[in-house]
Amino acid sequence: MAHPAPTDPAAPARWTVEQYLRLVDEGVLGPDDKVELLEGVIVTMAPANLPHDAGVVRVTHALIRAVGDRAVVRVQLSLKVGPYSLPEPDAAVVPGRIADYDHERPTTALLVVEVSDTSLKQDRLTKRALYAAAGIPEYWIVNLRDDCVEVRREPEPDARRYASVKIARRGERIELVGLPGVSVAVDDLLPSPPR
């Protein structure tokens, strides 16, 4: 759902990252506004629920343990992927060291992860197209509805899609293509089934 734009008739039809950040700096958008910039549109993020929160915690812990100091794991922080998009993925593994991002946002990632319950359609369509167009080599959707992880690889930026899509299930491991030798168990990413 698009966030209502400021009532200024001169507001652009498509917001740039710089214009969006100015709205944040000027207090037009605040911390209580759960929005992100996708393709120049200010979009309301799906509200978090307990399964989503549990998934984010599990993904965070699993990635930090697996990646160690070979890259940086960022959680629900913005990623600048072009002049019109500043998504806030649930997790991103970015190259470099923590200090590399003290004064600037990352513009790429080795892996982006969305934990998906109520946002599955947007994560499969809008976010997939956005991350593929940015050339992000690997995109996982931790699909809470179907209790699996959708692994997308081999981005085709011009087509805004991934050539490879695999479903990973409990009992399997997923190796990160950007960090050879690093893998994560699917069971560590998915919340435990309800009792």
Segments from the language model and where they lie:
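Gly/Pro/Ser/Thr-rich low-complexity, intrinsically disordered segments predominantly at protein N-termini
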Residues: 1-195
